[in-house]
């Protein structure tokens, strides 16, 4: 599983990094995105949907860290 660590980064950087990871991934790959910017809670799911990918899991971890697991279901260009 590819991990995108956006802890300590604020909008719009987590979205930029998540998008780049999705663009560089192959269909079928799983990406884990970690962020602690409160805006990411809404921004990342919107990005995933916009790019046609699948949000497999979302959870709030300790210390305000948000964890998103995304499955790449189609190429992103």
UniProtKB/Swiss-Prot annotation:
Transmembrane domains' residue ranges: none
Coiled coil location: none
User: Where are the disulfide bridges?
Assistant: none
Query: What is the protein name given in its UniProt record?
Result: Putative sulfur carrier protein AF_0188
Stored SUPFAM superfamilies: SirA-like (SSF64307)
- Report the InterPro entries cross-referenced here: TusA-like, TusA-like_sf
Q: Quote the catalytic residue positions.
A: 11 (cysteine persulfide intermediate)
Family recorded in the similarity comment = Belongs to the sulfur carrier protein TusA family.
């Amino acid at each position: 599983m590819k991990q995108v660590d956006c802890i300590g980064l604020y909008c719009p950087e987590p979205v930029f990094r998540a998008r780049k990871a999705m663009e560089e991934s192959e269909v079928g790959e799983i990406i884990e995105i970690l962020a602690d910017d409160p805006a990411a809670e809404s921004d990342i799911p919107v990005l995933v949907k916009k790019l046609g990918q699948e949000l497999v899991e979302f959870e709030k971890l300790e210390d305000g860290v948000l964890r998103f697991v995304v499955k790449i279901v189609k190429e992103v260009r």
